[in-house]
Amino acid sequence: MSSSRSGLTRVLVAVATALVSSSTPCPQAWGPPGVQYGQPGRPVMLCCPGVNAGTPVSWFRDGDSRLLQGPDSGLGHRLVLAQVDSRDEGTYVCRTLDGVFGGMVTLKLGSPPARPEVSCQAVDYENFSCTWSPGRVSGLPTRYLTSYRKKTLPGAESQRESPSTGPWPCPQDPLEASRCVVHGAEFWSEYRINVTEVNPLGASTCLLDVRLQRILRPDPPQGLRVESVPGYPRRLHASWTYPASWRRQPHFLLKFRLQYRPAQHPAWSTVEPIGLEELITDAVAGLPHAVRVSARDFLDAGTWSAWSPEAWGTPSTGPLRDEVPDGSRGHEQKLEAAAQEDSPAPPSPSLQPDPRPLDHRDPLEQVAVLASLGIFSFLGLAVGALALGLWLRLRRSGKDGPQKPGFLAPMIPGDKLPGIPNLQRTPENFS
């Protein structure tokens, strides 16, 4: 009894749903033919594919003779299922009033798309690529629509729909799923990426604004080689090349960082070399060393690249540098010779006395002598002029005023001086 009531309730709900959606057309084919899609917990409408619209049909589950919906339901060629769940997935068969086979429909359940997760990266200064992943697994066939446009400055409304700003399609990589590539981008411009996920139950869009100089991440350097330096048991020479994806231009260069460590040592030593090679001078003698290198834009745009594959090298175990014959000098001698050709080094000082006599005709020595004579002459003239000025001043002051007593005059009374009479007034002098 309860089962019959539940069945009746199910039919009534289906009829009500059908009446509400009677004007809704059948879902368009999406994916393989004869397959329709629905969402758990929602009503689903199936259409008989082999009859005209409105033709009454009977519906059965494939392999089951029990009638699901008769031709007198008033729904014509459509079957409505209310609040479907995983038990409703499968194949349904429709037949006309005279029992002619009308077709088969397979129902698959899933979820509508969620907002996809998008990230972009540039491996050079002209092109960038974007990859994405679904926000959730829908269980349904999915397509992605990708496009981009160049963003305009605030207030430039006249250029917002200009052909020079897009939108343009972002071509999807046929060899790599969920990836599209933008070619010929402007390094200092900002772009808006549109990735829309579409499945039979709907669509969801993600918009991402990117700047090329922010998402720049070069590929790792290539061709890393590590070589020993003959005669130097603590040296290694490492060299590498630019990544093939980076077009070398004078104003778009890369800088590098290099890490190395001896075998069985977990800690890395890091240096930032200048150019495409580095001479390691503190290697551990006799141990193999792992070396790796990464790259970044010379002006620090973006981020460092991933590390290159490790290369291994062991320092030289031969005789020391001073014991190496001239004919067997290694790579370091070539580097030193090339450096001397480009910029010859000054000769090293000698400890032996020079037997050659001094050449006083040296222009530098003559200039030094003349400078010394000039300084002494100036000082002599200055002292002479000062002495002459003092003498003239004293002479002029002696002619203009009365003569002053001598140096000893204040010390000896005048009447005691020999040959000078006593001029003091006494009564004898006036008598």
Curated annotation (Swiss-Prot):
Provide a GO biological process annotation: cytokine-mediated signaling pathway
The major lineage groups are: Eukaryota, Metazoa, Chordata, Craniata, Vertebrata
Signal peptide feature range = 1-23
Q: Which residues cross the membrane?
A: 372-392
Please name the InterPro entries in this protein's record.
FN3_dom, FN3_sf, Hematopoietin_rcpt_L_F3_CS, Ig-like_dom, Ig-like_dom_sf, Ig-like_fold, Ig_sub, IL11/IL27_subunit_beta
Q: Name one GO cellular component term.
A: extracellular region
SMART domains associated with the record: FN3, IG
Q: Which domain of life is it from?
A: Eukaryota
Protein name according to UniProt: Interleukin-11 receptor subunit alpha
- Gene of origin? Il11ra1
Decide whether keyword ATP-binding is in the record.
no
